[in-house]
C-alpha cells in the first residue's frame, strides 16, 4: 500500500514540474510536405497491409467482405515539448502510435464488417484545440485537407462502388464531421453510407441536412456518437456537450441505462476482452460509465475523463453492431 501511495505522489509531483515552451507561430511555409495518397507508403493500413497483430482481430477472409471501413485516428501528438503544429507522415514515432494503438484498439472493432483503409495525415498537435486563434485553426484545416484528399483517392482508386463505414475518434471525428458534409450529406454518395461512427467529439443532431442520428441497432445511412466520462463526472466546459448526440454504445437505442450483463466486451491493452465489465448511464451529452472491471481498475478510479477509451471500452459492442448494420445495408440494397 505504501508503494502505491508513493507512486501516486511521484506522478503528481512530476506533473507539477512544468517546463515553459515557446510555441512558434503557425507557418504554411514550414508545414510538412503534402502527401500523395496514390503511394501505399502514405497509408497506415490497406487491405493488403494488415499487421500480424491486426489480423488477430480481423476476418480470415478479407477478400469476401462486401463493405469498406474508412478510419481516421485520434490525436496522438500530445507531448508539450513537441513544438510542431502538424506531424509529418514519415514520423516513425507517430506511425507506431497509429498502427499499434489507434488501429489495434479502435479500428480493429470494424475489421469483420469491411476492408480497412487508414490514411496517415499531417495531424494537428493537441494544443491546436486550445490555441485556435493563434495557429490551431490553420493546423486543423491542414490536417483535414489531408483526410479529404485521402478520401478522394480512396474513392478514385479503391472503392469501386462498395458501401462504406466511416469511423473516427477525437481529432479524427473533427475531420469526419466535415467529410460527411463534403461527400455524403444530400449527395449521391449518401446511398453508399452504411453508418458513421463519429466518436469522441460534440456533434449536434441537426448538423446535416439529410444524415440523421441513428436510433435503432439496425438503422443505416446515419451516424452515432458519444463522449464517455466516469459516472458523476463532467467536462470543464460541460455546456458544450448539452444537446449533442449521445448514442447508447451498448444497446444502440433510447435506453438510458444498462446492466453489467448487457456489456459485451472491453478490449484492454493486454489484448484481452473483458465482458460484463461496466454499466453506463446516458445523460445530456455524455455517457457515464462505472469503473470498468479489469486488472488495472484501481488506477482507473483516479480518472474522470474516459475519452481515450471511448471506443475500446465498448469494443465488442461496437464490433457486433457494425456487422449488424453492414448486413442490414446489404440485405436492403440487394
Spans of model-derived segments:
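Positively charged n-region of N-terminal signal peptides that target proteins for export
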Residues: 1-4
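C-terminal motif of bacterial Sec signal peptides marking the signal peptidase cleavage site
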Residues: 13-16
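Surface cap/lid and interfacial helix-loop subdomains adjacent to catalytic sites
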Residues: 18-19, 148-160, 182-328, 332-333
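N-terminal extension/subdomain marker
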Residues: 18-98
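Active-site catalytic motif of lipid deacylating hydrolases and related acyltransferases
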Residues: 22-28, 73-162, 295-312, 316, ...
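Structural recognition of the beta-strand scaffold that forms the well-ordered cores
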Residues: 68-72, 117-120, 165-166, 195-198, ...
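Gly/Ala-rich beta-loop-alpha elbow adjacent to hydrolase catalytic centers
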Residues: 168-172, 176
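Short, hydrophobic alpha-helix immediately C-terminal to the catalytic nucleophile
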Residues: 177-181
Amino acid at each position: 500500500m505504501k508503494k502505491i501511495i508513493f507512486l501516486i505522489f511521484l506522478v503528481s509531483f512530476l506533473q507539477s514540474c512544468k517546463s515553459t515552451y515557446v510555441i512558434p507561430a503557425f507557418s504554411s511555409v514550414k508545414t510538412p510536405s503534402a502527401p500523395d495518397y496514390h503511394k501505399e507508403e502514405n497509408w497506415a493500413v490497406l487491405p493488403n497491409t494488415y499487421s500480424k497483430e491486426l489480423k488477430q482481430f480481423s476476418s480470415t477472409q478479407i477478400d469476401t467482405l462486401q463493405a469498406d471501413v474508412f478510419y481516421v485516428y485520434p490525436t496522438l501528438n500530445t507531448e508539450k515539448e513537441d513544438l510542431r503544429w502538424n506531424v509529418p507522415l514519415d514520423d516513425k514515432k507517430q506511425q507506431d502510435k497509429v498502427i499499434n494503438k489507434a488501429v489495434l484498439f479502435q479500428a480493429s472493432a470494424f475489421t469483420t464488417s469491411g476492408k480497412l483503409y487508414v490514411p496517415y495525415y499531417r495531424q494537428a498537435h493537441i494544443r491546436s484545440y486550445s490555441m485556435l486563434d493563434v495557429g490551431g485553426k490553420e493546423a486543423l484545416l491542414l490536417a483535414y485537407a489531408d483526410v479529404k484528399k485521402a478520401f478522394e483517392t480512396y474513392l478514385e482508386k479503391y472503392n469501386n462502388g462498395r458501401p462504406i463505414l466511416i469511423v473516427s475518434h477525437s481529432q479524427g471525428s473533427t475531420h469526419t464531421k466535415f467529410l460527411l458534409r463534403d461527400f455524403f450529406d444530400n449527395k449521391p454518395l449518401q446511398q453508399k453510407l452504411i453508418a458513421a461512427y463519429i466518436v469522441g467529439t460534440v456533434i449536434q443532431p441537426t448538423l446535416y441536412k439529410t444524415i440523421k442520428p441513428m436510433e435503432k441497432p439496425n438503422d443505416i445511412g446515419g451516424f452515432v456518437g458519444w463522449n464517455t466520462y466516469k459516472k458523476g463526472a463532467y467536462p470543464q466546459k460541460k455546456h458544450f456537450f448539452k444537446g449533442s448526440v449521445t448514442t447508447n454504445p451498448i444497446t444502440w437505442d433510447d435506453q438510458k441505462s444498462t446492466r453489467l450483463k448487457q456489456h459485451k466486451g472491453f478490449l484492454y491493452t493486454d489484448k484481452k476482452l473483458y465482458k460484463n465489465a461496466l454499466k453506463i448511464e446516458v445523460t445530456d451529452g455524455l455517457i457515464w460509465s462505472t469503473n470498468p472491471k479489469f486488472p488495472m481498475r484501481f488506477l482507473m478510479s483516479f480518472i474522470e475523463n474516459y475519452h481515450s477509451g471511448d471506443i475500446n471500452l465498448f469494443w465488442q459492442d461496437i464490433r457486433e453492431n457494425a456487422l449488424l448494420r453492414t448486413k442490414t445495408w446489404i440485405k436492403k440494397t440487394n
